[in-house]
């Protein structure tokens, strides 16, 4: 969460460059303050695993002078004084974008965002984000500002410093915007675009507002999904159905077909980030992944929730502190919500309903509407000395109380959204959710869940448990034994990865395998020792030494 600065948000795309080549004034003097190659590469930190691949996916060259000229034009629109760019500065990288700040001669600032190759298909990513922001700001009246700031570490700590009553007011304001998203439903599932970006022959967007009125807006259309699940882990280069779709069932079926297509056609399966696989544990195969995905497709119609929460909605799926701007004079007032890249029109139940700003490392509440008990939480820290134990208990109690308050607010104000929240707690939703990443990992666990359901008469899948129909999926006795063996091996693989991370140090794995440059200098001394110790512990012969050398996940 950050206090809002007075700067503009500028997206860079190929169409911007074309506009500049065809007549924009060359009246910007950009003063670079760093190595030009640093503008193009990822400099925020280092990757612990497969660094060269991660860096290549985040390297993008662009014309900084062209972007600066466009920044001047944007500044002129917002201010009568800006005529010249006097400084450029690259801000800390996002995981999917480069961000450059341009300072004008009148002190105003423009922030330009350039998508990395891993952000999505070049001809769709920016087009969809801009159209989405336009629709949200001008049709739904959501505060999508003409501003973008990169929040530094100190600014990101603002949420933690707020009083509890202020935090709840922020959550109440977030719920207000969620209510607007809830009451706007779309005819299709996919992503928003301007019609002239994807072809004027495409149908105009059709949506239903809070009053139940169906509206057709000729400026927009619904096209292919730009969701991260369609681009990550090599999927970006694959040719599969990205939508749009007309039903939630079609949307979910496309997920399974995508995972099968990628599993069958990728030259090499992606390496799991959560498990270490070798012959001593479990080794993934295309066959086991396809079995899991085909099983999902057979069960799909039994997994879907009731129709009322299958409707298509726009949603912000990453409401963490960096994406919420507040009024410096009134910290509970939300000025704007940013980062709508990869926004998808998806089924209501599919969207993350509880804002990520509520996430915490602690025990789950027993039920969605249960309230935490301070005495129970204090018991978790009995082994810690005072006053540390009391501080930990109070902090955890506060975080759990905010989750409880938010859930009660949703239950009271938005019962349909609460129904979606309830569905997200079920096995049916977990089976829908886990399918989205079976290309990468999880097939052994997925099949074990299905095997357990078969052996227990599908007790957690109500549509199967209460039907006289023939079960669509039946594993043989031999297959059940193989699934159990694979599950045990896969569990061991995950335990080995956790052990490796403990040996190296948990503090280096808090941010998706990205560390600061100083941390990298530290951990690069630790990793070789941990690797040597790990292989000595688990390798039983020369063959396994070679295997574990090859399987070792960290550079």
Feature-to-residue mapping (PLM):
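Residues that cap or delimit alpha-helices
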Residues: 12-16, 24-32, 44, 163, ...
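Active-site acidic catalytic loop and adjacent metal/ATP-binding pocket
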Residues: 98-101, 112, 295-350, 543, ...
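Long, low-complexity, polar/charged, intrinsically disordered or flexibly structured peripheral segments
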Residues: 214-306, 387-420, 424-431, 453-554
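C-terminal subdomain of alpha/beta-hydrolase-fold enzymes, centered on the catalytic histidine
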Residues: 320, 332, 341, 441, ...
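Active-site activation/catalytic loop segments of kinase-like enzymes and analogous catalytic loops
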Residues: 350-412, 426-445, 455-457
């Amino acid at each position: 969460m950050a206090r809002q600065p007075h700067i503009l948000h500028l997206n860079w795309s190929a169409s911007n460059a074309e506009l500049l080549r065809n007549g924009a004034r060359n009246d910007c003097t950009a003063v670079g303050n760093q190595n030009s190659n640093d503008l193009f590469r990822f400099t925020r930190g280092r990757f612990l695993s497969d660094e060269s691949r991660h860096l290549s996916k985040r390297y993008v060259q662009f014309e900084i002078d062209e972007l600066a000229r466009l920044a001047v034009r944007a500044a002129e629109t917002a201010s009568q004084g800006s005529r010249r760019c006097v400084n450029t500065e690259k801000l800390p990288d996002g995981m999917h974008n480069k961000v450059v700040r341009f300072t004008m001669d009148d002190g105003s600032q423009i922030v330009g965002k350039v998508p990395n190759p891993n952000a999505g298909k070049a001809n769709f990513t920016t087009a969809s984000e801009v159209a989405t922001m336009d629709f949200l700001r001008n049709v739904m009246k959501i505060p999508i500002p003409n501003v973008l700031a990169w929040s530094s570490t100190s600014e990101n700590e603002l949420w933690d410093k707020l009083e509890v009553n202020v935090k709840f007011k922020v959550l109440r304001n977030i719920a207000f915007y969620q209510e607007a998203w809830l009451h706007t439903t779309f005819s299709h599932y996919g992503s928003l675009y301007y019609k002239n970006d994807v072809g004027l022959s495409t149908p105009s967007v059709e949506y239903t507002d809070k009053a139940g009125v169906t509206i057709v807006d000729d400026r927009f259309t619904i096209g292919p999904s730009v969701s991260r699940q369609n681009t990550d882990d090599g999927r970006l280069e694959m040719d599969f159905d990205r939508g749009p779709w007309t039903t939630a069932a079609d949307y979910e079926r496309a997920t399974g077909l995508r995972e099968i297509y990628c599993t069958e056609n990728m030259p090499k399966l992606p390496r799991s980030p959560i498990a270490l696989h070798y012959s001593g544990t479990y080794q993934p195969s295309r066959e086991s992944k396809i079995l899991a995905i085909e099983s999902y497709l057979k069960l799909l119609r039994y997994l879907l929730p009731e129709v009322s929460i299958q409707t298509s909605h726009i949603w912000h799926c990453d409401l963490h502190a960096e994406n919420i701007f507040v009024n410096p004079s009134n910290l509970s007032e939300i000025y704007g919500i940013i980062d709508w890249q990869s926004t998808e029109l998806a089924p209501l139940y599919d969207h993350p309903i509880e804002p990520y700003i509520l996430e915490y490392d602690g025990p789950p509440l027993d039920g969605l509407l249960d309230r935490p008990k301070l005495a129970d939480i204090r018991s978790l820290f009995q082994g810690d000395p005072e006053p540390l134990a009391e501080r930990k208990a109070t902090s955890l109690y506060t975080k759990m109380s905010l989750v409880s308050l938010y859930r009660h607010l949703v239950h009271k104000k938005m019962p349909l959204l609460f129904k979606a929240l309830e569905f997200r707690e079920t096995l049916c939703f977990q089976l829908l959710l886990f399918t989205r990443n079976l290309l990468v990992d999880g097939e052994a666990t997925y099949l074990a869940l299905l095997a357990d359901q078969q052996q227990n008469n599908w007790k957690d899948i109500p549509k199967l448990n209460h039907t006289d129909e023939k079960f669509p999926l039946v594993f043989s006795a031999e297959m059940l034994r193989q699934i159990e063996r694979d599950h045990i091996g896969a569990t061991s693989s995950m335990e080995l990865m956790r052990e490796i991370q403990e040996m190296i140090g948990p503090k280096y794995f808090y941010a998706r395998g990205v560390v600061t440059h100083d941390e990298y200098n530290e951990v690069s001394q630790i990793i070789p020792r941990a690797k040597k110790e790990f292989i000595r512990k688990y390798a039983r012969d020369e063959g396994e030494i070679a295997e574990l050398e090859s399987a070792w996940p960290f550079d």
